[in-house]
Amino acid sequence: MKVFLVHHGEAAGPDVDPRRPLTAAGRTAVERLAIAAAARGAKPVVVWHSGKLRAKQTAEEFWRRCNALAEFAATKDLQPDDPPQWMLHRLRGETRDVLIAGHFHHLPRLHALMVGTDETSAGFPPHGVVALETLDEGQTWSELWRLEP
C-alpha cells in the first residue's frame, strides 16, 4: 500500500479571500507536481482532503492527473491541528493506495509518525509531496520519493 502526502498549494491570504483558494502561482505549482507525481507512478485509488478549499483544489488536480477514477472525498482527521495519530490509525485499516491533501502542521507530524523520526528532522517539503509505502499493513513505512515545487 502506498500513501501520497500532499501539502496544499500556495493559498491566498485571509485578507484577500477568507475562503483561501489557491493563488495562480499555487495552481501552476500544484499542476506541475501532479504531473510529476503521475509520471512517478502515483495512482491512488482514493483521494482524501480536509474539506478546506485550498486542500480540495489541490486534491482535485492530483485526482485529475493521477487517477480520475479514484474515490474523491473530504474526510475527518485532516485539519491542521488534528492529532496525526487519528489518521495513522485510519491508514492501518486501509489496503488501497491513498492520496491525502492536507495542511501544515498536520502533514509533517503524520509523516514523522509514519517513518519514525522527529518531526523537525523529517523535513516535510512545504507545498510538496511525499510518497510512502508499507508492506506490513501500516506498521512500518518507508519513504519512496518526494517532490518539491
Where are the regions that the model predicts?
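Residue-level signal for well-ordered alpha-helical positions
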Residues: 61-62, 113-114, 135
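Domain-level recognition of soluble alpha/beta enzyme cores
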Residues: 117-142, 146-148
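Short, low-complexity, intrinsically disordered N-terminal peptides in bacterial proteins
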Residues: 1-2, 149
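A glycine-rich beta-strand to alpha-helix segment
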Residues: 96-112
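Short phosphate-binding loop-to-helix
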Residues: 76-95
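Active-site-proximal alpha-helix that buttresses catalytic centers in soluble enzyme cores
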Residues: 2-82, 107-108, 117-129
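Glycine-rich phosphate-binding loop signature in dinucleotide/nucleotide-binding domains
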Residues: 40-43, 92-96
